[in-house]
């Protein structure tokens, strides 16, 4: 998790955000740099694919990555940052559902919630574009909303 935490710090630094600030000063509150989430939906007859979810939390910020292979074998990675409240990290394998691959991979805003104490679960939602659920290992809890983007890997 140390490498993932360092990757998360670099992601926030690139956007001018210090994820370790305490928000005691109003100018430290940089949530306006992150978009906020859509509402999750359920899909009928949606494809279900295996995915990997990693969440690194910094009290008021979190860094989220989701990896999966589409039906053609192409690997995709979503990477984003969010504002909210939580502590700890979680990493887990789960299921990704979506209605349309093109719609999912164009989604930017998301919400994430997780709870873990030597096991637990997480949900990442792109609203009507897709949802990912995982059981994982780590310790912590959190609820965040933010934005990011998809890219093809490899």
Where are these regions (language model features)?
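A membrane-pore/channel beta-structure motif
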Residues: 2-154
